[in-house]
Amino acid sequence: MKLTGLLSLALLTTLALAAPDPKKNGPNRDWCGQVCTGKNDCSGECNKCVNFVCKRTSVLIYKEYLHKNATDHAARLNATRHLTIMIDETTRVDHVTVKFNVETYGMESITRRPEA
């Protein structure tokens, strides 16, 4: 009887481990890791299909915002240099730079930090 119980437990554990991860394979296409076919079926930050998996390859550029709102030419150049941030599956956003830019240029949000 104990052997049958152990076999049942082992089978349930195996099935649980083999279950698809809803974060990666669910209907929410904003999670990186979403399965894709390459026909624009990734969205949000995870907007590029690479080998049937959505990847994060967003380029966030705030030049338009800064050119309309910066007070002088030097501020525009400085802001543009600091606020062009590339995000991909390996890059991490520097929170010190983000905080500096938000405080200096009055932007509410630049980007969320990619998951580790």
UniProtKB/Swiss-Prot annotation:
Disulfide bonds, paired cysteine numbers: 32-46, 36-49, 42-54
Keyword Signal: yes
Keywords: Disulfide bond, Knottin, Secreted, Signal
GO CC, alphabetical: extracellular region
Residues annotated as signal peptide: 1-18
Subcellular location: Secreted
Family per similarity comment: Belongs to the UPF0499 family.
Domains (record comment): The presence of a 'disulfide through disulfide knot' structurally defines this protein as a knottin.
Annotated protein name in UniProt: UPF0499 protein ATEG_06693
Organism annotation: Aspergillus terreus (strain NIH 2624 / FGSC A1156)
